[in-house]
A protein has these predicted regions:
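Short hydrophobic alpha-helical membrane-embedded segments
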Residues: 24-27, 89-96, 202-212
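Membrane-embedded alpha-helical segments that form the functional core of polytopic membrane enzymes
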Residues: 23-82, 98-102, 110-121, 172-180
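Juxtamembrane helix-capping/reentrant segments at transmembrane boundaries
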Residues: 11, 69, 73, 77-90, ...
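Membrane-interface helix starts
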Residues: 15-25
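C-terminal membrane-associated helical module and adjoining short loops/tails
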Residues: 1-16, 120-251
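Membrane-embedded alpha-helical segments in integral membrane proteins
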Residues: 31-40, 96-100, 156-160, 213-219
Length: 251
């Protein structure tokens, strides 16, 4: 993917364009993708199909932009601590937005929404905790690029499925549950991967997890609606994981 997609894109980007500008464009693309997924259940079948196809294009574009900004920075000798900070800092928002986009698009039950959303932000926070401790950014078994390719395919598939059949039919229901639980299974494996490398020393990580669990409980009890829960987890990730980014890069 890097060779066939990203490198040709990098070659045509003018040198005067800042890598941070590309990073900010990517943030806008992620927000657009989230909005399309969030509104899709309220749309007519054809409109829903178009919205999810648009979300798939946005997801795939974001995957390319996420690689292109760093490649462009190295190519034009514009690498900086600010660029590294901005990239990781915005990922604290991107990660929960991508995860919740899939959940909202699939209209998963509250229990599954909480499990998949919290596991996604837990992975990134644990990854940053390991980065802060060891000074090296360790990539999980399933990379972000691979996850985004899978998400793109799922968005396209879901668009077709929801166009052909109503969401709340037995077969479609099993498709949704299967997709959501498969996502949680792979995310749980990622959590285990980082916990093992942290040697299960989770002192700085545990408060973040407990705050997420508290928000999950409020959602299950009805005190937080679906969108409110997503916003709360995004804010938690932005503050908790963002603090790790700042502390690590400021060392």
């Amino acid at each position: 993917l890097l060779r066939n997609l990203c490198e040709p894109v990098v070659k045509v980007i003018p040198a005067w364009i800042s890598p941070n500008m590309i990073t900010m464009v990517n943030a806008c693309v992620i927000v657009l993708m989230f909005a399309l997924c969030a509104i899709s259940p309220r749309l007519a079948p054809l409109d829903r199909l178009l919205a999810l196809f648009g979300a798939a294009v946005a997801m795939f574009s974001s995957m390319i932009l996420d690689s292109v900004d760093g490649m462009h920075a190295r190519r034009t000798n514009q690498t900086s601590k600010l660029g590294e900070f901005l990239d990781h800092w915005l990922d604290t928002v991107h990660v929960p937005l991508v995860s919740s986009s899939i959940d909202l698009m699939l209209e998963v039950p509250a229990v599954i929404l909480g499990l998949t959303l919290l596991s996604s932000v837990t992975i990134y926070h644990a990854q940053l905790a390991l980065y802060h401790r060891g000074g090296k950014f360790v990539h999980p078994p399933t990379s972000g690029m691979e996850a985004q390719v899978i998400a793109t395919v799922l968005l396209l598939t879901s668009g077709v499925v929801f166009y052909l059949w109503p969401r709340y039919t037995p077969g479609v229901g099993w498709f949704v549950i299967g997709a959501a639980l498969s996502s949680f299974y792979f995310q749980a494996r990622q959590v285990k991967f980082f916990y093992e490398r942290l040697e299960w020393k989770l002192g700085g990580h545990l408060p973040f997890v407990l705050q997420g669990v508290a928000l999950y409980a409020l959602h299950l009890l009805g005190a937080l609606g679906r969108l409110g829960f997503v916003v709360a987890v995004v804010a938690l990730s932005f503050r908790g994981s963002g603090t790790y980014v700042l502390r690590t890069l400021a060392k």
